Amino acid sequence: MGLNTIDDSRQGITRYLERNPTTSFVRETSDGIIDGAILAGHDGRRGYVYHTAVSPEHQHQGIGTALVNATLHALADEGIIKVALVVFSRNDAGNAFWQRLGFSARDGLTYRDKALYAITRIDT
């Protein structure tokens, strides 16, 4: 998944949700168990989907699609007209999911990042 100890900590996610209070969603079962979530936001110009997850036992039931659609509507309501995201190239299921939803791969781009603090990967 690409998680790390700083921005994916409870404090990091809380800070993110405070900055983006209307564009991220969770889905709960009737028993109150979270089985899906999406973290998304925008910079005033472009929307970004940062994390999307559905528990393995609840996949292929439309939960991910419903979460994405809710986020896209929320971003559109805030005047955002284009949304971007990053998917690991080796994530075949994830890439197929986003392609089915109309997200196209971009050629000619190289994704780069730089940690400003020491981080530890906590990939699941």
Predicted regions: what is each one?
Residues 2-29:
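Active-site rim helix/loop that mediates acceptor-substrate recognition in acyltransferases
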Residues 45-56, 85, 110-113:
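Conserved acetyl-CoA binding element of GNAT-fold acetyltransferases
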Residues 51-56, 60-73, 96-100:
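Conserved acetyl-CoA-binding loop-helix of GNAT-fold acetyltransferases
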Residues 68, 75-87:
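Conserved GNAT acetyl-CoA-binding A-motif
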Residues 32-41, 48-53:
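Conserved beta-strand in the GNAT
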Residues 29-36, 93, 106:
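Glycine-rich acetyl-CoA-binding "A-motif" of GNAT/NAT acetyltransferases
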Residues 99-108:
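Conserved acetyl-CoA-binding loop of GNAT-fold acetyltransferases
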Residues 85-94, 113-117:
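Conserved beta-strand-loop-alpha-helix junction that forms the acyl-donor binding cleft
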